[in-house]
Design a protein with these regions (language model features):
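Generic detector of low-complexity/intrinsically disordered segments
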Residues: 25-26, 43, 49, 63, ...
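Short interaction-prone segments
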Residues: 55-73
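Short Lys/Arg-rich basic patches
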Residues: 1-21, 69-78, 82-87
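Surface-exposed, Lys/Arg-rich phosphate-binding patches that contact polyanionic backbones
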Residues: 6-7, 13, 21-40, 44
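Short, basic amphipathic alpha-helical segments that act as recognition/interaction helices
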Residues: 34-61
Length: 87
């Protein structure tokens, strides 16, 4: 028997972050596919990561691979913390 989780009231704040251009394009496209805001998508990804879980199903990961190709995003997790901004 599935249980329905109650909505949890939170306080959100506006923040400005700098993020790699192609990565942002992919994230926005994923949010659009999932019919959610970019903020909701990012919260979900981070909360899953904090628990060592994947935020995406196998089907979603296939869609993300297609979006990465579409937007020319070649970065991988091993590239994190090694990105240098162009001047």
């Amino acid at each position: 028997m599935a249980t329905t989780k109650q909505n949890i009231e939170v306080e959100r704040i506006q923040t400005g972050v700098r993020i790699e251009k192609r990565l942002l394009k992919v994230l926005k496209a994923v949010a659009e596919l999932k019919d959610m805001t970019l903020g909701d998508l990012l919260e979900g990804i981070v909360l899953h990561a904090f628990e060592g879980k994947s935020a995406f199903s196998a089907a979603s990961l296939k869609e993300i691979e297609q979006l990465k190709k579409l937007y020319g995003m070649t970065l991988q997790s091993s590239d994190s913390h090694h990105l240098k901004e162009r001047r």
